[in-house]
């Protein structure tokens, strides 16, 4: 069979034409050394600070130290499968995470990967984890209340939408309980808002360095109460690598900023930032960065300030959205003057102080109302609340002062005895069981009863019973009064005070 030369040349031409030129160019480097979750990589000359890089087997890392001859990369995952000589690829993207409504009701890790077994998350967008905080011009003063449902906080240390309020205390003082109650309290408000996105508050809870069992318990509680529908849980637990614990708060803030930037409202709880600082210290020391006070690196203040500055209230031109932050800090032996606590106190707009002593006395939430402060929240209080809350702060401050002196002498004049009696009852009134947040109107009613002498003749041990009875009476017989406080937000004085007084008197007359 004769082979035609023309045919051969035609076949070759066709082959050349159909040759696929899908060559992929990737900038790669080699691992020089690896250990303790840190890899030293040679050859990634153009890598950016904070860029995501990829190791064999899909393990990801983040370039943090850009040095003259190598790059220090922190590894998001186990470093056991990475060895010297492995190739490392650039991804050309700064670390980003998924964001959007699709994340609501889900539990994810610090990179936005699902942990709850409910399938993949097809998020509408991705956001850079460590983005820049809004400037001065787009912001607005905090003026809308963010109700926690806790009497002691809503009355005396009010938090507004867009505020950063620190929750600080020793271990086992109920810090997470305060934050969790705040998330649960939003359910009634979100249900009442219906489709009005402007009134809803979405919640993001970040667990940093906690036990998995604790996080599982919290998620279970959110599911039982139905609060998971408007919440996102970001978990970087104690068994996760330090880089994941460092990244989780930034990633969660990026998810929360989706709501803020779309004219909606979000609340983010960082539980807790002490553990984030510890994991950042670990990474920095392993990267051979010079240590400073308490062996923390020099930029540990910036670590928290750039995170918390992203929580803000935006003005109407920028959508009017807000992001409220409740960072949690754990102190050692009540030492508030340690490095991290002082840093975060100076960054935030106030702090809620929880004390071990109060906790063991049975005063829960164990809020020290003398040391706790809200620097911007008073302008966000409802009119009804601010008109009844003033006398409480004063009465409790005087009570604390007098109680110290009263221990020394027994012959006290009548006015001092009255002050001590009322202070003891108000302190009792501020107690509240966990998972039972109250509405704004219910708190106003209870505090009004306390400051207007309705508790003065009742035994301290009966205050809880009186409160329970009064709340049931108001909910079943005087719902119109509660609705009036909620909808009209009147200043409780003059006729308004008389109306509320009459409703309480109706119950107090029959209480025994």
Swiss-Prot record:
One Pfam match: ATP-synt_ab
EC identifiers of the protein: 7.1.2.2
Annotated site residues (Required for activity) in this chain: 372
UniProt xrefs under SUPFAM superfamilies: C-terminal domain of alpha and beta subunits of F1 ATP synthase, N-terminal domain of alpha and beta subunits of F1 ATP synthase, P-loop containing nucleoside triphosphate hydrolases
GO CC terms of this entry: plasma membrane; proton-transporting ATP synthase complex
Main location: membrane
InterPro entries for the chain: ATP_synth_asu-like_sf, ATP_synth_asu_C, ATP_synth_asu_C_sf, ATP_synth_F1_a_nt-bd_dom, ATP_synth_F1_asu, ATPase_a/bsu_AS, ATPase_F1/V1/A1_a/bsu_N, ATPase_F1/V1/A1_a/bsu_N_sf
Family, similarity comment: Belongs to the ATPase alpha/beta chains family.
Protein role: Produces ATP from ADP in the presence of a proton gradient across the membrane. The alpha chain is a regulatory subunit.
Name of the protein in question: ATP synthase subunit alpha
Species for this entry: Jannaschia sp. (strain CCS1)
Higher taxonomy: Bacteria, Pseudomonadati, Pseudomonadota, Alphaproteobacteria, Rhodobacterales
